[in-house]
């Protein structure tokens, strides 16, 4: 097979192979020899470091391309299963997979355009990682892009494939995909807090009254989402429906700039819902200027038809329809496109155009701000236009159960910033437990946006639910705001290190067959492992359950303080108050310590949750200006490290906080640290130095509910390093853990809807704690407990650290 090597390419008769990396090939075939070097919708960068490969002619004239990880054999002619195949090497270098052109790809899936009207699961598109050890992305039909315009390919029959042969090295596959398809942009910090959204006829007065009620209840919100009733919806019949609208309803919002400023004064940004499909009709405020600009007949009330392919319309679309409202205070747009995939240009999805042009326009005239939209997924490459709106889900346990998997799997195609209708959108029945579990999932999702449809009974205000549901949902919404320093660091890592916030289990642990079965378990950033509960509580035990895999190591439940030994499967049981969110021993988790208000800027008071028991580290990332493009000089980095040693019955741990590196203006002039020493109940020794100066430490209370001792550190200016050294008794710690176990079991029994005598018999088994083996105690508990769910919870508690 004759092929000419040019750099990283092999070109021959009607074909071109490009070796992007030793594991990533581009395969092109065009009878017209029309090969694409420019950008497409999916691909924006094919410039990779040089990769080592060999091209040779085989004994039967076939072309053979070899890298360290794969071997391609091509016999010439139009690609087919007979003439093109690739052998893929496993991680150990042995041939372990074979692909023929046209073979069905069984990847670990990617994501879908929308969850509109879905009750439960739906089929997902393909991703770039696979248990087959390879995957293929087809870029043949995507549009080409140049100088802000989209074009069809010269040869519409050309084949343009990307072959990913990364074995189980899923992280590298994802990083190279981002290199190829563009990095995930940085999000504004406020987006990582809470969003209030509801399809409901609000007025300026009623909306602000609600925001003030949230403030009185100490429920923080950072984003106000105004659904379609902000604009005129009741229009004369001759104009059609009222779904499309760009004129404020002055009966409801008489002074829009005043309303938007009032939201800003409350610490909230604002997005408006738009359905742009009907263009601009004669009743719109912007019609005269836009109609004159477009040259349509105003006397006949000729509409300005929606056509993003028309460059002039596109200019006016933003100039007359959006920019004036942005000047009044609208921050970004919720693009609610539901009119299909026909744009008038074959292969070009109008949703893609809307996402692209809206995102780019939202950056500002000089591209100085971070672009932002809320819109549906439009295919591979959509990660460049965050944030994703997953659509109008059905309110059901089935929908909730699908969402963790749906969110995590989207990372397999780089789509890391989904925003779901938390609590569900429509239909369904009221279920306070379902609402609460959905809020808990939302707090540990990329974006936390409560939403519901236009139904007077379907609101997501916490006080509309039972007392327990109200209390729990409020606490979780407050926690979401507290998580912003951690989430903003993950935002930085998603952009700079190409690591999405949410990752399935199989990214962090060497995959084995059963690992893929834990579909609803995922990593939430670098430090937390989440296993949300997506089923209703058992009526006897009052507990929800999730089956989870715990990777090797010792894990601590963020909410309960329970310690769990990894390397095994567990059934985890939790009351409505919490879900399993686990941190490994040694984890350092930074939280915003402010208890009131909507502000999410870099906090003066920071809580550090230090999970005792192992070495660990964390680097906090903060910036000053939130520039659109990453500028390292604008960022500040604070390093935290924990060193753990144990000797002679004493445990010693040393926490180091490094001097701030980078832009000191990204932090407050002084910062206070409130430490939660998780897994520590009392101290035998304590010392603190800032630089070379020894300072006092304020020892606070011990919080049994999270098994944490509180310490308050003096104000810190970031210029000197902090060294905190503390010691505790291993014997006392073991005694405390037994006490915590007894209390945990007592609460399980106290809650259970079983006879008092049965509770007493079960609790009597604990008299032998510390005397008999856990296996013997478990056997006794098992024989005395009639409830399967309660038995499971007791087994979890008693075997938490291994039997």
What are these regions (language model features)?
Residues 1-36, 55-74, 79-81, 91-94, ...:
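Mature N-terminal, pre-catalytic/accessory segment of carbohydrate-active enzymes
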Residues 359, 380-388, 402-406, 410-420, ...:
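Catalytic core of carbohydrate-active enzymes
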